[in-house]
């Protein structure tokens, strides 16, 4: 989306950012489908639809740097594993979500989940949970909360490493901060189809 540059779009109600830099071509679309392989993530604790929007729609030259930038006086490794990074990701995603409004559908595929992100390639930890299902919603918080709830109610032996990764990186802050920013509803109903 950023082949021809970037544009700044507002982060409504943002505490960390007032605007986010996204790929210029995003303005050419009136809707978006977010198809996500839900899994662990080295920095985010877990990678769901929010992480994909936050990092995927932020442009490479400016937006991604905004999300990953720690204050000058912070130890970067500690900062990256804390709540401020999660809040940066949430606000980055909020800009895109606000831009599209109700014209977004989120699909989280909870299959072949590992503690590591797909970007780790062949170095990724082995798959522990093979198939928990596919969740879809037009509410970002509902689909992420339901995904996390399915992980946390799975047998401990299958997803212990993933739960540990989520907690060690403060990944659940993604959910609580989305709730604080009124980005969706953490109450949901699962409907089997």
List each model region and its residues.
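Extended, low-polarity segments enriched in aliphatic/aromatic residues
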Residues: 1-193
């Amino acid at each position: 989306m950023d082949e021809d540059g970037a544009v700044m779009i507002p982060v409504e109600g943002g505490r960390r950012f007032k605007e986010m830099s996204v790929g210029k071509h995003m303005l050419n679309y009136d809707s978006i489908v977010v198809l996500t392989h839900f899994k662990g993530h080295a920095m985010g604790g877990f990678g769901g639809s929010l992480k994909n929007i936050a990092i995927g729609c932020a442009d490479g030259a400016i937006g991604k740097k905004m999300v990953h930038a720690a204050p000058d006086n912070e130890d970067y490794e500690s900062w990256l594993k804390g709540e401020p990074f999660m809040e940066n990701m949430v606000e980055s995603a909020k800009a895109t979500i606000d831009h599209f409004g109700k014209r977004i559908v989120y699909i989280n595929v909870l299959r072949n989940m590992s503690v590591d992100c797909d970007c780790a390639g062949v170095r990724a930890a082995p798959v522990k949970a093979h198939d928990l299902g596919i969740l879809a919603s037009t509410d970002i918080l509902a689909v992420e909360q339901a995904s996390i709830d399915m992980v946390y109610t799975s047998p401990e032996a299958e997803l212990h490493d993933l739960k540990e990764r989520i907690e060690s990186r403060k990944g659940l802050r993604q959910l609580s901060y989305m709730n604080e920013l009124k980005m969706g509803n953490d109450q949901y109903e699962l409907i089997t189809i």
